[in-house]
Amino acid sequence: MDRLLIRGGRRLHGEVPVSGAKNAALPQLCAALLSAEPVTLLNMPRLQDVSTMLRLLHHMGVGVERSDDGPLRIDAGALHTPEAPYELVKTMRASVLVLGPLLARRGAAKVSLPGGCAIGSRPVDQHIKGLTAMGADIVVEHGDMIARLSAGRRRLKGAHIATDMITVTGTENFLMAATLAEGETVLENAAQEPEIADLAEMLIAMGAQIEGHGSSRIRIQGVDRLHGCSHRVVADRIEAGTFLCAVAATGGDVLLRHGRADHLDAVIEKLRAAGADVQALADGIRVQSPGGAKLKAQGFRTTEYPGFPTDMQAQFMALDCIAQGTATVTETIFENRFMHVDELLRLGARIQVDGKVAVIEGQPRLSGATVMATDLRASACLVIAGLVAEGQTAVERIYHLDRGYDCMEAKLHGIGADIERVPA
């Protein structure tokens, strides 16, 4: 198990290539199950969660080919085992995304209840409710979701699905399943994240008929079959946002190549209000900052897209810890998503938490210490804090970081950070 050693105090300058989005890549790997023809995915990030998903697909009989830095080719023509066993899904929440494609393509699936970050329950009941409306019979037994088509059905059927809450993975599961369903499916209260729109574009390239993706109401007309395609995974807005916060905190001038400013409106608005200069360019996003100590702390409330993303809450909190003034942060999406606060306190931050609300009082300095990552985005938060802390910070349990960031320490080192990965 590795850890990161960070010696803070360096400004960041240069360029960082933004990788493909984890939250787009994982559903797109699952979407390849919908076709018997090969699918090629470009800009696929090298992440632990991606590796786990590829092992799961291989277990099902799916062929996977990937060169060192080239495209990823997936051939589900020989799909023979529509199952996702616990030993392969226990570390990855996104494994539930195979449920819809397997039902649509094979008419049956057995998927263990998934694991992933310990930041809340994130129940699968909405998935079960929606797929049941499409003609599936689903029971949960011994930790597995066992699904099959209702008696007499050969395909899923179109349905009108209005979820009780906005669910990203639920929207993705219904979207994929509906492409091969009989008739029309309408998704109300659909999640609007850019990664869902990117998934829809991939499905359309495979022959799906989809309208309204990127809005809260999506219409899908089912087709008999989908063919293969080539698709480029959209840039990771959370990785880009993380680097924006890092540069804002340390000070410097960095171009995030391939970054999509239009996917980060809420975060960029807060960074500009704090005093950072963030520019949307044709080839990415440029951020210039005098450093966190000269910025003004900004409060925010996490909400579904296009609001402030919960996946950026921890990283922006790290910036607030050294900015001027006091900020109030309200987390509305997940419970237990302030676990990074105790670790920030070890670095000298001043934060008070009351339920879903955290109040951060900016401090003139943080001091390096050993801290422990508790989840994916908390890991990134602690890295940012370490970049500005005086002395050395050691971040333990960075396997969380490897689940969602492609070579983060190498990218930071390339723009001037004093950071290295060492055995724990």
From Swiss-Prot:
The modification 2-(S-cysteinyl)pyruvic acid O-phosphothioketal is found at C117. It is an enzyme of class 2 (transferase). Keywords: Cell cycle, Cell division, Cell shape, Cell wall biogenesis/degradation, Cytoplasm, Peptidoglycan synthesis, Pyruvate, Transferase. Pathway: Cell wall biogenesis; peptidoglycan biosynthesis. Its EC number is 2.5.1.7. SUPFAM superfamilies: EPT/RTPC-like. Gene3D superfamilies: Enolpyruvate transferase domain (3.65.10.10). It is found in: Cytoplasm. Transmembrane segments: none annotated. It catalyses: phosphoenolpyruvate + UDP-N-acetyl-alpha-D-glucosamine = UDP-N-acetyl-3-O-(1-carboxyvinyl)-alpha-D-glucosamine + phosphate. The active site is at C117 (proton donor). Cell wall formation. Adds enolpyruvyl to UDP-N-acetylglucosamine. This is UDP-N-acetylglucosamine 1-carboxyvinyltransferase. It comes from Verminephrobacter eiseniae (strain EF01-2). The lineage of its organism: Bacteria, Pseudomonadati, Pseudomonadota, Betaproteobacteria, Burkholderiales. The gene is murA.
